[in-house]
Curated annotation (Swiss-Prot):
Keywords on record: Coiled coil, Cytoplasm
Any Gene Ontology CC annotation: perinuclear region of cytoplasm
Subunit structure: Interacts with RhoA.
Function (record text): Binds specifically to GTP-Rho.
REM-1 domain: residues covered: 25-99
Any one Gene Ontology BP term: signal transduction
Protein name per the record: Rhophilin-2-A
Name of the encoding gene: rhpn2-a
Keyword Ribonucleoprotein carried by entry: no
Record domain BRO1: where: 110-501
Family annotation (PANTHER family): RHOPHILIN, RHOPHILIN-2-RELATED
Subcellular location, record wording: Cytoplasm, Perinuclear region
Family, per entry: Belongs to the RHPN family.
Record's keyword annotation contains Coiled coil: yes
């Protein structure tokens, strides 16, 4: 949406001077920013190593000298080892969860946040100036402030603050990208602006001249920022846990929108498969926070309450095990951080142990009293298992104290085994071994179960062969995604001085402004105005002075007496014409020209392959000989790019494209301005 402005209000001042956007924090201010700085440095090292590997592989294919081949193979082994080391360093940053947690949080298992995607600086100045001069026929030097604001806004988005202000900053830039696409990025022309983003998990760069890569990456970073906000919440309070659940649900909403909108992606961290796993993981963490809120004030020693907590814990463990299963499927396993999959596996075993511990407390400590609803408790016990233990019924378990104790000890034994598995998994991963709060919590819960078991242990326990059945999971939590409303805050188009976006866009090319002196005859200028922002000349009298001066029917008036009127309505322009009180007045008009954009012969994207990750996407076009009868090869659009040339580049992935016929998501990222809701804008 664009503000309606009166003439003279567009003074060309920098938006940063008007406090239009709040910049992100300095890259050296916070521990999280320091991690992001390290990530940027690692990305550069990975890029350098991949270039060396590509060069070595090319030399290996080109030479037949055995001595040179041996030297190249040796160098290639060093490069691959260095790449593996850098990948492990990047994985260590991805699992640096302690930096993102609340400062007073030492009794909760850390949550996993997503790291922000890193990018390289982009210089819009030259390309946009050329386009403004050529397409809009305006003096590009007058838009220095707007260009500086745009580059400042993009730079600020690299280090957003970890709060709602940071989200608003990213959202404002995302909306600006919609304006920029309509103003400066014609579908049939390459401006020469290259957007480079690094994969969040592997650090592999993806470079493309299409603004849709920028849009998708900003959406990913909005989701990542929500996860960092969620992990920062104070999980020792009910409000903090509710905020954490909401933050993770908002993150899944953004990722789900990204997944449904893009069928193919240039980097694997934004592929549908990876996004599906990330959504499952974040919903599991939201469920984890819901369970923590349920037991925050303690669990009453009441039969149904303990049973509810046990089944809820079993459900949390179950969803984490589902995430672990997804993470271990190819090719997700090769790209997701190993420490993440281990952490998810640890949580699955931990909550499985908690479920068995709660059931053991019910069976061992709880005594049936006369005031209890026996039928209700019997029904609850029967729903706890898929099948009752051999030789036992729900009524027997309730009334036979000895059988209840034996079954409770079996559950305690099962809980201890799950605790031991969780500890074993965490110690097998060197990264998780260094997370002190995780090791402390796992050890404390393990000792609690052991203590409870020792209190009821007898010398002949080895004769008790009763095995505890699996607990049926049950939850009242509804896993859902929250769709953030990106249009809730009014955003000013940085390049609004170019004129209303519905008219002054890449779809229409304009002539240079023509100065025309119009004169009244019998109180009439000899033409009629219509339209709104800007006004158009119609019903022009061919014999009037304005027509003699060169005014044409269909011209748009952009200036009256030196005052810009692109944003003025018909009545406002008429008032400006009448306000001078003179018989003659100078106006500036423009006319629509035919589009004559030429198709570039080739649009190249930097490619740097990385073993067992993915390759970058190249916008390749068939190289044909230039002949007099040659027709310009039509470049496939960013939205419809698919797999091509499989024999030549079997590992090349497809570009992001919009799903045709997908369900409507108008309430997800709605824009009041029709121009931003158009299909051409939304990827």
């Amino acid at each position: 949406m664009t503000d309606a402005l009166l003439p003279g209000s567009l003074n060309g001042k920098r938006l940063s001077e008007q406090n239009y956007f709040r910049k992100g924090k300095s890259i050296a201010q916070t521990g999280r920013s320091k991690l992001q700085n390290q990530r940027a440095s690692l990305n550069q090292q990975i890029l350098k190593a991949m270039r060396m590997r590509v060069g070595a592989e090319n030399l290996l294919r080109a030479t037949s000298n055995n001595k040179i081949r041996e030297q190249v193979l040796l160098e290639l082994s060093f490069v691959n080892s260095n790449l593996q080391r850098l990948k492990e360093e990047l994985e260590r940053l991805n699992i640096s969860v302690e930096v993102y947690q609340h400062t007073e949080q030492d009794s909760n298992i850390p949550l996993i946040p997503l790291g922000l995607k890193e990018t390289k600086d982009v210089d819009f100045t030259t390309a946009f100036k050329d386009f403004i001069s050529e397409h809009y026929s305006e003096d590009a030097s007058e838009y220095e402030n707007e260009l500086a604001d745009l580059m400042d806004l993009r730079q600020a988005c690299r280090t957003p603050s970890r709060d709602e202000a940071g989200v608003e900053l990213l959202v404002s830039y995302f909306q600006q990208l919609g304006y920029l696409e309509n103003r400066f990025f014609p579908p049939s022309r390459n401006l020469g602006i290259l957007f480079t983003w690094y994969d969040s998990f592997t650090g592999v760069p993806v470079s493309q001249p299409n603004i849709s890569l920028e849009k998708a990456s900003i959406l990913f970073n909005i989701a990542a920022l929500y996860t960092q906000i969620g992990t920062r919440c104070n999980r020792q309070t009910k409000i903090g846990l509710e905020e954490a659940v909401t933050a993770f649900q908002k993150a899944t909403g953004v990722l789900n929108y990204l997944k449904e909108t893009f069928t193919h992606t240039p980097s694997y961290d934004m592929s549908p498969a990876m996004l599906g796993v990330l959504i499952k993981m974040l919903l599991a963490e939201a469920h984890e926070c819901y369970f923590e809120k349920m037991i925050l004030s303690g669990i009453q020693n009441e039969f149904c309450t303990l049973l509810k907590a046990a089944q809820e814990a079993a459900k949390v463990g179950e969803v984490h095990m589902q995430v672990y299963t997804l993470m271990n499927q190819a090719p997700i396993k090769e790209n997701v951080p190993y420490s993440w999959s281990v952490m998810v596996q640890v949580k699955a075993e931990h909550y499985k142990a908690l479920a068995n511990y709660f059931v053991a407390i019910i069976l061992i400590d709880y005594q049936l009293s006369l005031s209890d609803d026996e039928d209700k408790q019997e029904k609850a016990i029967s729903q706890l298992y898929d099948s009752m233990p051999e030789g036992l019924t729900a009524q027997t378990i309730l009334k036979d104290q000895q059988q209840r104790t034996l079954l409770g000890k079996a559950h305690l034994s099962k809980a201890i085994r799950s605790h031991e598995e969780a500890i074993r998994f965490s110690t097998l991963c060197s990264t998780l071994r260094q997370i002190d709060v995780l090791q402390k919590i796992l050890s404390a819960f393990h000792q609690r179960s052991q203590l409870k078991f020792s209190q009821h242990q007898k010398p002949d326990d080895f004769l008790d062969l009763l095995s505890a059945p699996d607990i049926v999971s049950k939850t009242e939590y509804q896993a859902k995604t929250i769709s953030p409303q990106l249009s809730k805050d009014k955003v000013t188009d940085i390049f609004q001085r170019l004129g209303p976006l519905s008219v002054f866009s890449v779809k229409q090319r304009w002539s240079a402004p023509r100065k025309i002196c119009i004169t009244k005859e019998d109180g009439d200028f000899g033409f009629v105005l219509r339209g709104d922002c800007p006004v158009q000349v119609i019903s022009l009298d061919p014999l009037c002075p304005a027509a003699t001066e060169g005014l044409k029917e269909g011209d748009y008036i952009v200036s009256v007496a030196g005052k810009d009127c692109k944003w003025c309505s018909t009545s406002q322009v008429m008032d400006m014409l009448q306000a001078t009180g003179k018989q003659s007045i100078e106006i500036q008009v423009i006319s629509i020209q035919d589009q004559t954009y030429s198709m570039p012969t080739k649009s190249a994207t930097y490619y740097a392959g990385m073993q067992k990750t993915y390759s970058l996407v190249c916008l390749t076009m068939d190289n044909v000989k230039h002949t007099k009868t040659q027709k310009a090869t039509k470049k496939l659009s960013f939205l419809s790019w698919g797999f091509r040339n499989r024999q030549k580049a079997a590992s090349t992935l497809c570009l992001p494209s919009e799903v045709k016929g997908k369900p409507k998501t108008d309430n997800l990222f709605s824009f009041p301005d029709n121009s931003l809701c158009s299909e051409s804008v939304l990827y």
